[in-house]
Every structure is written in C-alpha cells, then in structure tokens.
Amino acid sequence: MAKINELLRESTTTNSNSIGRPNLVALTRATTKLIYSDIVATQRTNQPVAAFYGIKYLNPDNEFTFKTGATYAGEAGYVDREQITELTEESKLTLNKGDLFKYNNIVYKVLEDTPFADIEESDLELALQIAIVLLKVRLFSDAASTSKFESSDSEIADARFQINKWQTAVKSRKLKTGITVELAQDLEANGFDAPNFLEDLLATEMADEINKDILQSLITVSKRYKVTGITDTGFIDLSYASAPEAGRSLYRMVCEMVSHIQKESTYTATFCVASARAAAILAASGWLKHKPEDDKYLSQNAYGFLANGLPLYCDTNSPLDYVIVGVVENIGEKEIVGSIFYAPYTEGLDLDDPEHVGAFKVVVDPESLQPSIGLLVRYALSANPYTVAKDEKEARVIDGGDMDKMAGRSDLSVLLGVKLPKIIIDE
C-alpha cells in the first residue's frame, strides 16, 4: 500500500515527479513481462522516433545472395557470364555436351548432346528441372583454377552490401483506474494486497492491449501462403475433414511454411502462432507435446512444442482461424531479425531496470477531486518498409508503422487461413 499512497501523496503535495520517481519505476516492471516478446523483435528507444537499420547482402546482379543459387566468385564469374548463352525455347535445341548456359542468372553445364530433345514438358523451368534430375545437365558452381586469379587483369566479383535505415514514430496507449485511496484502503481491510492488485490490473490490461496490437499487426504484415490446388486463396479447408486428417493436413502446411521462410530469408522459423481452434487441431494431431522437462525451455505464454521444434502460441482473441509461422532471431548484441519490431519508449531515462517501458501517472477527476492511477505506455511498432518499396527512393517515404502499406509484405512470417465448421452455441 505504501507505494500507491506515496504516489498519490506526491501528486497532491508537489509539482515535481522526482519524489515519486522510484515508485513510478517500481510499478512499471510488471507490464513488459506480459508482452509476447517471443514473437516480436524488441529494440528499446529513448527517442520520439524509433530508428531501425537493415543490412542487405547483394551479389553483382544486385540480388539478395540468399534468394538465388547463382555463384560469382568461381569459374563462371560475373564477366564470364556475358559470353554465356541464356536458355530460351530456341537456344535449348542447339545445346551440346560441354556447353554452358544460364537461366535466372544461374549457370548450368550440358552433360550430353541435345539434352532437351526427349523432354516433352512445355514449361521451360520445369523442363530444366527434369533435365537436372535425369543428369542431362548439371548446376555449374565450380571453383576456378588457381591460375584464373593470378593474372593482373583478372576480374574479381564484388561482395556488395547495403545498409538501410527506416523510422517509425512512437505512439501512446493510456489506461486509468477508478480506484481511489478509500477503495484501496477497503481492499486492504478485506485482505487484498492493494498495491499488487493495482499493478496487476493496469499492467495486465495494458499488456493485453499491446499483445493484441502485436498479434493483429503480425496477421496484417505476414505473407499469405498459397499453394496451387491446396490453398489457392490462402485458406486451407478443414471443414470436411476428420480429426486425424485435419491435424495431419494442418501440421504438414506448418512444416511447408517453415521451409518457405528458410528459402525466402535463410532464417529458420522460431515460432508458430495459431487461433484457439487451429491450435486445438494441432494439439489433437499428436504432433504437439508439452512435457514437464520442457518447461525450462518453453515460454510461459506458449501452448507447447510442435514435433518440428517450434513453440506454439495461442491467439485467443482472433476473429479468424489461422496459423502463422515466423522468425525472431537475436544475432549478437546489436542485430535482431523479426517480422515485427516492437520499440518501447523509455522516456530518455537512464534506468537500471531494463524492463521499464512507461510511467504510472496520477489523474484527478475534476468532479470528485479524487485522484486515480493511470498508466501511460509509449512504443513504436514497425515492419521493414524495404520489403514493400519498388525502389530505394520510394522506400524513404514509407512509414514502417503504416500497416496499410505493410499488409502482406513480410518475408519473415507466413499466414495460412483455416476454414473450420462453425460452432453452434445455444443461447
């Protein structure tokens, strides 16, 4: 009760916050513990505009190195490619053993004469895949002979990178209680711990607000996972399936989404979020486990571990049934990877407590003159705008917190809608 009383007393006896500051700090610790930090990249900020940086690793063709199978530092270098034939419907008929050709900047070597003569597939990309499987051609990623780079006029491929910066304005959320000093004293008289009661009330409700913002923003920015003939619209229809079939189908799609993220970003997925019913289907599938020995590794917010190692989080407030697979990776002290960035504003305070995210304030009702406790939290929530823009010039004017422009643009999280039979509830 002492902290609450001191905070209320400070509001009516002084114009300075310095006296009440230790109490403000102590009361704000609970909020961050309840935030879903496992599904969002967290970067604290003490500025009203949060700044984020992103590094792009590029090859000589200005492509992301992880999005192509092309190699440039070996026998088929960047300059050498200028003399290599591009694969087309016409050129594929003229290829012979030992020839090199390129397709989507990847170099291939022919292992036999007219390698495409017996392949009836009309789609050029699929025909190339068949030729690789049949050992008619191979991927040409060979390292160069030692003498290639010993001459003075040898061409060496550039290892390129680009550092981008984007900013998102810090925004606010504010809650207050109607609990007065008298009510707090009544709570104490009836056996309640009033300070803990107020802390839990405000911190829990504020964390619930922020978590909804995080989860709903994650739903917005995630790419939709569409597979021809299975999830053409971004939905998987499980409204007809038996429980084992539904669980097996949904778990299979989760595993495919993990592979998709790894292919598109090189990062391995670290979490899975599902609506309540979708999480129940995964649990019924038999591929969700929660053993007592897992507790030291599993977040207290998680439902359990899927068989592929991903912790499963349950979104109980979602208006739709869905499953999301995503990445949050802390790489060293400064580098964080994630689909959504959460930047709590620390008000410029140099605090020893790393969990401080906001401040409790005193609000006086002008009608009753009764002081009430309020919690003000400021933070920025952002996705990477460089996944949206057509070019760098356009990216500079995009706000990472503008979820209208960020919709469906993140390569670090993938969403699949789940169609389930409607629940009938008798009124």
Swiss-Prot record:
Keyword Chloroplast assigned to the entry: answer is no
Listed under GO cellular component are:
viral capsid
PTM section of the record: Proteolytic cleavage at the N-terminus by the prohead core protein protease gives rise to the mature capsid vertex protein.
Q: Which UniProt keywords apply?
A: Capsid protein, Late protein, Virion
Domain of life assignment = Viruses
Q: By which gene is this protein encoded?
A: 24
UniProt source species? Escherichia phage AR1 (Bacteriophage AR1)
Q: How does it assemble?
A: Homopentamer. Interacts with the portal protein. Interacts with the major capsid protein that forms hexamers.
Q: Pfam families of this UniProt entry?
A: Gp23 (PF07068)
Keyword NADP set for record: no
Name of the protein: Capsid vertex protein
Tell me which family the UniProt entry assigns to this protein. Belongs to the Tevenvirinae capsid vertex family.
